[in-house]
Structure formats: C-alpha cells, structure tokens
Amino acid sequence: MRPFLVFVLIVSVSLAFSFEDMPNKGGDSVASITADQARGHKRNPLFPFAQRSLTELKAGGCPLYCSSQIFCCHGRKCRNVDGRLKCVTEASMLGK
C-alpha cells in the first residue's frame, strides 16, 4: 500500500509542476493553450493523460490545431492547412 501512495504522490507533484510552467493567459483560446502544452510534453512522460484531461475540462472550446495527441471536436477533421494541422469542418474545406 505504501509504494502505491508514494507513486500517487509523485504523479500528483509531477502534474502540478508541469501545469505550473504554463502562463495563465485568460484571453487565449483553448487551442493556443493546448498548443503551448504540446510544446512542453517532452518533459513529462504523463503528458498525454494530463493534456487530454485539461482538454476535457475546457469543453466549451474546440482546439484549432491538432496532432496525434490533440483531438478535434466532433464534426471536425484534422487536416493539413498551409503546413499546419488544423481542426476544420467539411464546409470550410470546400470554401463555404
């Protein structure tokens, strides 16, 4: 039981420090916040779990950029637009 508690404590501290480095930009969209997180994921091996949880907490917005770890909202597809992977609707891809 004690090793499990130590593990939970380490994971909690590691997640806390990974979010502490992120600036709090109140006016930014969810997309830019998740893009900032994507740059820092190499430092934290638990990042995909943490990033997905944060994205789910911010359910009011939809990411603009996507990757193998950042998913688009329902009804949007991840497409290469001008060399960047973006979440787009079918209508916007057709120019409507």
Curated annotation (Swiss-Prot):
Its main location: secreted. Keywords: Disulfide bond, Neurotoxin, Secreted, Signal, Toxin. Residues 1-16 form the signal peptide. GO terms for cellular component: extracellular region. It is found in: Secreted. It comes from the Eukaryota. The recombinant protein causes paralysis to polychaete worms (Nereis virens), the natural prey of terebrid snails. The cysteine framework is VI/VII (C-C-CC-C-C). This is Teretoxin Tgu6.1. It comes from Terebra guttata.
